[in-house]
């Protein structure tokens, strides 16, 4: 048994958080968007590099019901959405929505501010969803990726939950990096591009 990992999938409403999780776990895609009614917790077992890990994947909007993704001052206390005890984060935005990218930017800052002193740094993967709508994107991929990787020091990846493109890859990269962070004796690996040889599958 490999152990357990706690993952939070966060982002503005409507960016496709639940769709990404459902593609990863069940291989399906909801054609009609239905707002997530409160936080949901999924507990799959995953085989990664020959070891089995129990995952806790938290899905839910950070902002409370009826609120807008305007800024962190509108969000609940960090303890209410488990920022402090999460091992890894997926921050999802819509590549066609600059507001959702600003939301992720503020959310990343909120995560950094609420981590307890001395706690290990949790890896963050910023994910641009809806790559199938590439022609409508608000900014070039290379510029956004450079900002996230160099400026924010986070991983960056784009996916399409609708067509299940890069969905498995994003979880594989996030989980492997979380395991490396949990074992400081191992050589440091960069989040982006470190996991192409790794094997990851659901049990």
UniProtKB/Swiss-Prot annotation:
Post-translational modification: Isoprenylation is essential for nucleolar localization, and the proliferation-inhibiting activity of RASL10A.
InterPro entries named among the record's database cross-references: P-loop_NTPase, Ras-like_GTPase_Reg, Small_GTPase
Lipidation (S-farnesyl cysteine): 200
Propeptide: 201-203
Small GTPase-like: annotated span: 1-203
Keywords (A to Z) from UniProt: Cell membrane, GTP-binding, Hydrolase, Lipoprotein, Membrane, Methylation, Nucleotide-binding, Nucleus, Prenylation, Tumor suppressor
Record localization: Cell membrane; Nucleus, Nucleolus
Binding site for GTP: 11-18, 59-62, 129-132
Modified residues (Cysteine methyl ester): 200
GO molecular function annotations of the record: G protein activity; GTP binding; GTPase activity
SMART domains in the record: RAB (SM00175), RAS (SM00173), RHO (SM00174)
Family: Belongs to the small GTPase superfamily. Ras family.
Name of protein: Ras-like protein family member 10A
Biological source species: Homo sapiens
